[in-house]
């Protein structure tokens, strides 16, 4: 039988999960030169406004596992962002910190989000002289 303390803890936790923001966008960088996740890479998120100007939304750094999972929050399905966005990955800074020469000072990946999709994952595989991207899940 569950103790009263466990039941109360479970009941108190419910509102936290109900109000937690979901994230429509995540990214991941794999450094194929080293075979490791690329940690501490600065990544900026931009949206394209109606005047065709890029507006910076956020700036984050990849975690130790090379991921950023909390880009572009929304609270309700009807509030999901849509439109054209881009991620700007500061790859030269990453390779300079490892004392490795690289060709690309940064990598920009543009993409379009739809309100119909719950989540988008935009990973890149990276080397000092090349990169690749695809729509992940």
Stretches with model-predicted labels:
Residues 9-39, 47, 54, 132-133, ...:
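Beta-strand-rich domain onsets/edges
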Residues 42-46, 86-88:
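Beta-strand signatures of extracellular beta-sandwich domains
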Residues 39-43, 120:
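Short beta-strand/loop motifs in extracellular/secreted proteins, especially
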Residues 57-61, 76-77, 108-112:
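Beta-strand-rich interaction surfaces with strong enrichment in secreted/lumenal proteins
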